[in-house]
Amino acid sequence: MKKLIASLCALSMLLCMVGFDGAESVSDQEAADAVAEMIDAIYVQSRTEETDAQCAAAKEAWDALTDAQKELVEGEEASPDYFGLDTGDASLDDPRNADDIGEKEILVVSFGTSYNDSRVADIKGIEDAIQAAFPDWSVRRAFTAQIIINHVQARDGEFIDNVDQALQRAVDNGVKQLVVQPTHLMHGAEYDELMESVNAFADKFEAVAVAEPLLGEVGNDATVINEDKAAVAEAIVSAALAETDYATMEDAANDGTAFVFMGHGTAHVAKVTYSQMQTQMNTLGYNNVFIGTVEGEPEETACENVIEAVSAAGYKNVVLRPLMVVAGDHANNDMAGDEEDSWKTMFLDSGVFDSVDCQIAGLGSIKAVENLYVAHTQAAMDTLSK
């Protein structure tokens, strides 16, 4: 309640600052700081009864600023890009938060992204594919990142359920059979947290099944590969080649070109999955493919180590592409951004390579990947009847 009162007070003060003739004069920076404080208040990974009002108040306050004041918005997390960055048309998305679900639901759970175009192409793309494959089931959406949910809600007025909200919606609508399909890559921390939430609601349904994440079981070490990893490896390689003039990876290698697929990385034991994907690429004969991660977990996937590996292998041209379901902030900024710590910049600044190109596309927009999610959903459904 204190945060809500503070936000409403900031909004009231701001409207007085910029909205009424004869109001006490304040600096542009003070007006911007008031909005930054409101943005920081909703940049949190927890939802409260105050969240909806805080999101609405932050947007109203932002809209009341002049263009010059908007450029001055800076906080612990706040920046002009929070409301000002154009990431595409949110109206093309479907939050899939409607009631009238029926008795059979597929809940597609994603981390989420505030990039509208990517959300439509990648997350909605997967959801649409699953809905088309199972027309007798209702597909609904949940995001695990409340920070992203709040961002999209405040900026675009799009309301997306978090996992607990989505599960409660299913209960309230009388769902009897529930299949949960995570779009996460692996059995990592996000998957573990999802399982905790699902288990807390499990006794509310007649039957519940949780499908495999994209890359399937983790395995014990870097040598463990499986059909899911092979399918994803083939899919991303095919998609990457399609955006070049090369017909095959062998052609690219002969021309001195390497492909670096950048994942997120994790300190979770599941980080071995990235090492397994490198093993999978090598097993398929894609020796000019290198797996990296933003977080540098596992260690060999850190940017500087990947640069060293690509250089040692003798490649002079590099294509960077995200190994992520969504091409959101990490793809646009950590990978392809112009900042000094982006992967593109670090590869260029190494002075080793003749060219560094970026492909910004998520796994979710690749048809073969969508089909793999459909297969995982079907496998989970099959367990309901056993």
Regions found by a protein language model. Give the residues of each.
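Beta-rich interaction/scaffold domains
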Residues: E24-S91
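Extended amphipathic ligand-handling, pore-lining, and cofactor/metal-binding catalytic surfaces
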Residues: V26-Q29, D81-V319, M324-K386
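Hydrophobic helical h-region of N-terminal Sec-dependent signal peptides
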Residues: C9-L14
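Sec-dependent signal peptide cleavage junction
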Residues: L15-S27
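Positively charged n-region of N-terminal signal peptides that target proteins for export
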Residues: M1-L4
